[in-house]
Design a protein with these regions (language model features):
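Aromatic- and carboxylate-lined catalytic core of secreted/periplasmic carbohydrate-active enzymes
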Residues: 132-134, 138-175
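Active-site neighborhood of glycoside hydrolase catalytic domains
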Residues: 1-124, 128-149
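Short conserved micro-motifs at the rims of enzyme active sites and ligand-binding pockets
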Residues: 115-116, 208-211, 227-228
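Solvent-exposed beta-hairpin/edge-strand motifs
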Residues: 216-232
């Protein structure tokens, strides 16, 4: 199928490989030998297909979907550029999902998209949360205001500029969302001359106490310029 599509439409730039259909009614009392191996052989067969796809199209980016169905595995990283961790793209829930996911896979494998889930959350909040992984947009552009569209353009530029830190840097989990009402993570690039801090007030409350966050991973002898980014137009 992949080869047929790439032959007909060589301009295809990206594949989403979805695996949501479970295998049902697979066992039989008449087939005695090695029935318990079915899932093992199925996965081996999948890898065999992916090996052929990768050999013929080595530079084709592919996302492995069905993140909630056990498709996020280390072997698949040989063939896919990213995983879809969950169909739950509510930005508040994603703070928790991405925190847990980060204990097993690096940020560059985590497809994190801005969607229309939780429209009570601003486009800025949704985008900032998604920038902790591989940023993408699954949202109707025409439903956004001109200011929101302009904001997203700037956020994409910032993401591309800071990609070496976010996607390839060291991750520091500073404040766990599971231990309070806030969350903070930090990425530092290999040269320790660039870092990105993400800090979120998950459920803002009146007169709540905000504790300072101690940064990590920076060079102790260096001086850094701190700048807030991803601001909406006309916001200082």
């Amino acid at each position: 199928i992949v080869d047929n599509l790439m032959t007909k439409y060589p301009g295809i730039a990206y594949f989403k490989w979805d695996c949501n259909s479970p295998i049902t009614n697979i066992y039989s009392p008449y087939l005695k030998d090695q029935q318990s191996h079915l899932y093992i052989e199925h996965v081996k067969g999948l890898y065999n297909v992916l090996e052929r796809v990768k050999a013929k199209y080595p530079n084709l980016p592919m996302m492995l979907c069905s993140g909630g169905g056990g498709r996020s595995d280390y072997e698949a990283l040989k063939y896919f550029t990213e995983f879809w961790p969950s169909d739950n793209t509510d930005p508040i829930e994603r703070i928790f999902i991405q925190w847990g996911y980060s204990h097993f896979f690096p940020s560059k494998t985590m497809a994190a998209h801005v969607t229309s889930w939780n429209k009570n959350a601003s486009v800025k909040f949704r985008t900032d949360v998604a920038m902790m992984g591989k940023l993408g947009f699954d949202i109707r552009i025409h439903d956004m205001t001109p200011a929101e569209q302009e904001y997203c353009k700037g956020a994409v530029k910032n993401f591309n500029r800071l990609g070496s830190a976010i996607l390839d840097g060291d991750l520091y989990r500073l404040v766990s969302p599971y231990e309070g009402n806030h969350s903070a993570v930090m990425y530092v690039n290999e040269a320790t001359d660039k870092a990105v801090l993400f800090a979120f007030d998950i459920h803002p409350r009146y007169a709540e106490t905000l504790q300072p966050v101690r940064l990590q991973g920076l060079a102790p002898e260096a001086q850094y310029e701190i700048k807030e980014i991803n601001l909406l137009p006309d916001t200082k």
